[in-house]
Amino acid sequence: MAAITASAVNEFRQATGCGLMDCKKALVENEGDFEKAVVYLREKGLASQAKKATRVAAEGMAYAAVIDGVGVIVEVNCESDFVAGGPLFNEFVSGVAKVIAKEAPADVDALMACPWYTGKGTVDDAKNELFLSVRENMKVRRFERIEGKCVPYVHMKGKVAVLVELETEASAEAVTELGRDVAMQICALNPQYLDESNVPAADVEKEKEIRIATAKQDPKNAKKPDAIIEKIVVGGLGKWFKEICLLQMPFVKDDKVSVEQHVAAVAKELGTPVTVKGYVRFEKGEGIEKRQDDLAAEVAKMVKG
């Protein structure tokens, strides 16, 4: 039997839309015959997956957890909230997180080729097996893995997930409440940056120019010199930083202090420094353009078969 080349497997994968390992196995079992391999996949119930691969998967869930001391956040998409709320999909997402924590894959492609956490097959195999049950297009969209002291937060069954990384000598248990409070702040207000020092200088300059132009159009500033207007605007940038930077934001549970001040107060109580080192926020379906179906047309299509 001729060897099955990587290019042949890739070509077959592009033609069918099925998983890499499934395509390779189908070709091996059928001695490289594409037509027989397609029949093989159809018999396994996998070929229909290719037809659904182009359908928009904008539902699903964002998930965050700490697994064996490793922080993981991942977004997995499917087509309907019905499937997203089911136990099989939730188990798959949880399993994906376990694999990410253990295997530390470089990207999604590498993740899909990793061994499944049960020891049976790969992540791609597990996804294909789930497809046979739910019959929906699914995709592991993105993930982050952090080896540090992390606190996870999942909002509304996976609509938003947040992973906060803290730097401290305090125990994970001691900073759990703080981390959760900060994560809830991130979830609700979606800050663009951790701290004002992280805001690119070009963005600050652009905001400054916009505010100066706006101020000059205000009749109250008609007689003020440009230098005075600029000074007023620069002084007002602090308010802008409070809107876009996590640590400068008013703390949601006590808006008399900033998040940074609240963290400092907790650190003082614990008797050891605590720093918010970073965070990741995933919102389910963020940036995915959902298909807008015409219900009447869809029903008519179903009736016609």
Per-range role (PLM):
Residues A2-G305:
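N-terminal assembly/interaction segments in proteins that build large macromolecular machines
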